[in-house]
Structure formats: structure tokens, C-alpha cells
Amino acid sequence: MRKDQFVLLSQNKMIGLFLGDTDFSEIVLSKIKKQKIKYFIIDFSKNNKFNKDKNSFRISIGRFGTIIDLIKQKKCKRVLFAGKISKPKFSSLRLDFKGIYYMPSIIKAAKIGDAAIIKSIIKILNNERIKVISSIFFNPELSLKKGCYTKLKPNKQDLISIKKGKFFFNKTKSLDHIHALV
């Protein structure tokens, strides 16, 4: 257990979970339950996946005021995003006052890409003094350190191919999502 996880556990703080679809959100939730950390869920899944949990709340993405009020009511200082949160149709969103205030920056970010939307939401939460934790904070075993994890070492042609991939990766925008480079 890392030091910052121990501090979070020892202070017995509440953590807010913005959970969407995919198995990753369930993995994060089970890990938090095992560590007996107080939590609440803001459910963004399509089919209300977490409605059986007593700490689950289904709130529309456009209701920033309600979300922020809930976070402050639970005395939560940290939130975590996990799972796939589908992009909403901005024309059909029901907005509250804070939603109306923050929506122009989110729509502007939506024109850039999905990662820009997440960054703008993180910026909004930072303005409200709410810290966003990395999604692998409780599951560090899901990420690997830098290095070669096979017995086979890359040959000269592989190294050239890797160099080309890095070149094309560096040419793309920082907010683009690239799933694979061949």
C-alpha cells in the first residue's frame, strides 16, 4: 500500500466515484469496497448499472450544480473517474444554473475531442476545490512500468518501426486518442 493510500484510509475520508460502463469501473469499486473506504457513486452508465448499491446516485451530466452540491454534502475532497462515460447529446441535456454556467466551455472542448471534455470537467472540479485522482490510484497492478516484459528483445527492424511509431505519435495533438500504431 502506497503512502498516499494509507493517508486516505487513515483519515477515513469519503471518495466520490464517477462510474460509467465497462468492467474497469466494477474493478475499481470492488477494490474500494475491499479496502473499506467510504464512497458514493455518481452513475453515468447507460443502463443504470450501479442502482443496487445504496450509495449510488443517478445524475445527468448537465446538472453540475447538483453533482457539486452532492460532493460537498458528502464532505468529499477527492473524486475518481472510471469506466466509459458516453458523450451526451448537448441539445437534449437538462441543465441547472451551474450547468448553464459551465456548458459553453464543455461544448468548446467537445469540438476538440473526448479527452478535452474530460480535461474541462477536471478543471471545473479543481475550481470547486475538488481533487481528481488517477483512475489507477487503487489499482496500480493494472499499469506497467517502463521496460521490456518479454524474453525476446527487439531487433534492428523492430527498433526502426518503434521509432517511426513514436514520430507519428508525437505529430498528433495531445488531446487525440490513438488506440494503436502499426
Tell me the role of every PLM-derived stretch.
Residues 91-111:
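A charged helix-plus-loop insertion that forms the helical arch/lid used to bind
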Residues 17-19, 41-43, 79-82, 132-136, ...:
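General beta-strand structural signal in soluble alpha/beta enzymes
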